[in-house]
Amino acid sequence: MSTQWEVVIGLETHAQLSTVSKIFSGASTQFGAEPNTQACPVDLALPGVLPVLNRGAVERAIRFGLAIGATIAPRSIFARKNYFYPDLPKGYQISQYEIPVVQGGAITIQVPANEKAGKPAYEKTVNLTRAHLEEDAGKSLHEDFAGMTGIDLNRAGTPLLEIVTEPEMRSAAEAVAYAKALHALVVWLGICDGNMQEGSFRCDANVSVRPVGQEKFGTRAEIKNLNSFRFLEEAINYEVRRQIELIEDGGEVVQETRLYDPDKRETRSMRSKEDAHDYRYFPDPDLMPLVIGRDWVERVQAGMPELPAAMQQRFVEQYGVSAYDAGVLTSTKAMAAYFEAVVAKAGAANAKIAANWLMGDVSSQLNRDGIEIDAIPVSAAQLALLLQRIADGTISNKIAKEVFATMWEEKASDDGAADRIIEAKGLKQISDTGALEAIIDEVLAANAKSVEEFRAGKEKAFNALIGQAMKATKGKANPQQVNELLKKKLG
């Protein structure tokens, strides 16, 4: 990208709230039901029906606001956003416009290094404008109806929290880092399941460019319904290139809504972009103002989980792990809980080795099997015992990997699985000094050339001798003792 242009990005994210019923009706929000089986008279906008606000949706919005340090509006109102679309039976969407329930707040993001561009990793705080409650629309189905469109209203009325940032991001990398941080937070808080394939978390990106140093924003295009982090990055990068090329060729960027085509990896025009006045917002006369007292906020605050940033700092201080390791361990609530359960069983002295195992062997196996840590077949108690056996010298770290693989495959239910497998396979580490000395004497006698090379100053020869000793014991020798005994015998 030309260095004379600055990219300006703001994101609007729709997080589907994890309530069992819809925001203004008692209909179910369960995903995947047969079309139009979860739409009640309120969702269908039948004559005479009235909306009733779901308290659980409000509490989830409060929880989010508290987590980002936002202001919870003591009084907010719902408005009608008027537009016509076949999957919107009322002819308007109930949303919030002038006074949203969550105002302000910020999220700190970690932007990874871009080695190709020579850019180091850095931290940035993205300020939020607002987060407001609204209902989702239904779904138009085009594929199964030749020449027609089917309408499924199961999704109509599903509660959404629309989270809007200030236009403060300056690259696709920053936008993706923000989206990932936001996704992790709403899942951590338990207010959204974060399932992007099912549409529970989707982003709209407002993208514009302007000459470096210019204060006035360029004309923006909005890219709708990006439901993967990869699509978000690709769509923004394409749109930035498109706008720069258009301007440099003498054209003008048009304010419009665009869609991203993942097959062609390009954005295309959908419709001209509406402004707020096009929707004729006005307060919904069927809904009273939403009044949130201080006592309500305090009750929600009392039930808040420990937030990732606070837990990360605690892990550094309490367990002595690095800030990076603490960040990985608190990437999900399930990962953090598993780590603490392992340490509780294995002892705080084994916290660092527990962290190394979770980020190494455990994560590798999870990725290989395509599962999350809450479905791990090795319990925290089982892993803790394995780590204790490394610490007390019963087995080496190398043998522990073999034991762990067996535990994973057999999905054992007994907490003592590690001891059972070690005993059954005869994997106990040889730590008897006399036995090891006898083995090392044999190794030295059989490898006179390596002994000569080591004494001539070749350090690699020493490693070769260690390898021979480990081979002679089938990997069961205590590596540290082998090292010490070899040094002693070689003088």
Swiss-Prot record:
Allows the formation of correctly charged Asn-tRNA(Asn) or Gln-tRNA(Gln) through the transamidation of misacylated Asp-tRNA(Asn) or Glu-tRNA(Gln) in organisms which lack either or both of asparaginyl-tRNA or glutaminyl-tRNA synthetases. The reaction takes place in the presence of glutamine and ATP through an activated phospho-Asp-tRNA(Asn) or phospho-Glu-tRNA(Gln). GO terms for molecular function: asparaginyl-tRNA synthase (glutamine-hydrolyzing) activity; ATP binding; glutaminyl-tRNA synthase (glutamine-hydrolyzing) activity. The keyword Protein biosynthesis applies. It is an enzyme of class 6 (ligase). It comes from Burkholderia multivorans (strain ATCC 17616 / 249). It catalyses: L-glutamyl-tRNA(Gln) + L-glutamine + ATP + H2O = L-glutaminyl-tRNA(Gln) + L-glutamate + ADP + phosphate + H(+); L-aspartyl-tRNA(Asn) + L-glutamine + ATP + H2O = L-asparaginyl-tRNA(Asn) + L-glutamate + ADP + phosphate + 2 H(+). Coiled coil: none annotated. It comes from the Bacteria. InterPro entries: Asn/Gln-tRNA_amidoTrfase_suB/E, Asn/Gln-tRNA_Trfase_suB/E_cat, Asn/Gln_amidotransferase, Asn/Gln_tRNA_amidoTrase-B-like, GatB, GatB_C_1, GatB_Yqey_C_2, Gln-tRNA_amidoTrfase_suB_CS. It holds the Pfam family GatB_Yqey. This is Aspartyl/glutamyl-tRNA(Asn/Gln) amidotransferase subunit B. Keywords: ATP-binding, Ligase, Nucleotide-binding, Protein biosynthesis. GO terms for biological process: glutaminyl-tRNAGln biosynthesis via transamidation; translation. Belongs to the GatB/GatE family. GatB subfamily. Heterotrimer of A, B and C subunits. Its EC number is 6.3.5.-.
